[in-house]
Amino acid sequence: MTKTPLTEAVVSADSQGRFLSTELQVAFGRFRQAGSSLEAAKALSKKASSLAEAAANAVYQKFPYTTTTSGPNYASTQTGKDKCVRDIGYYLRIVTYGLVVGGTGPIDDYLIGGLAEINRTFELSPSWYIEALKYIKANHGLSGDPAVEANSYIDYIINALS
């Protein structure tokens, strides 16, 4: 079962053999929050390609060796650059999944679980993705509650990478 604030509230009440009470207020709050989350997911999805491309350029600026080092895991060729943009897009897509479900379940299940092994196997530096996510956070164009929602999932991934 995917972990969300609502599923956790139901599990808690059920384990205590009681009906939902204060959890209903949490549920209503989550429904209000869901509108902002969905707005953020829609906006990030619409801009995903341009955000991933610009975030890759931010990585190249901060870590110029990524474009001068030869090898399949670097951006010294167009194929390498395409892979970098693809990978950043994957991180962004996982952020939108978290926004849609209202919890970190997809991030935990699809990204964080195997992250260390993937980075080690392919010699990928977490600092590249941290830089890309920081760029996306600073430039996604969201404001208000949608920005707060998106930024919380971006920060969650940054913390997991750190």
UniProtKB/Swiss-Prot annotation:
Contains one covalently linked bilin chromophore. Induction: Phycocyanin-3 is expressed in red light under conditions of sulfur deprivation. Keywords: Antenna complex, Bile pigment, Chromophore, Electron transport, Membrane, Photosynthesis, Phycobilisome, Thylakoid, Transport. It is a peripheral membrane protein. SUPFAM superfamilies: Globin-like. (2R,3E)-phycocyanobilin binds at C84. InterPro entries: Globin-like_sf, Phycobilisome_asu/bsu, Phycobilisome_asu/bsu_sf, Phycocyanin_a. Its main location: membrane. GO terms for cellular component: phycobilisome; plasma membrane-derived thylakoid membrane. It holds the Pfam family Phycobilisome. It is found in: Cellular thylakoid membrane. Signal peptide: none annotated. It comes from the Bacteria. One of its GO terms (biological process) is photosynthesis. Light-harvesting photosynthetic bile pigment-protein from the phycobiliprotein complex (phycobilisome, PBS). Phycocyanin is the major phycobiliprotein in the PBS rod. NCBIfam families: phycocy_alpha (TIGR01338). Belongs to the phycobiliprotein family. Heterodimer of an alpha and a beta subunit, which further assembles into trimers and the trimers into hexamers. This is C-phycocyanin-3 alpha subunit. The lineage of its organism: Bacteria, Bacillati, Cyanobacteriota, Cyanophyceae, Nostocales. The gene is cpcA3.
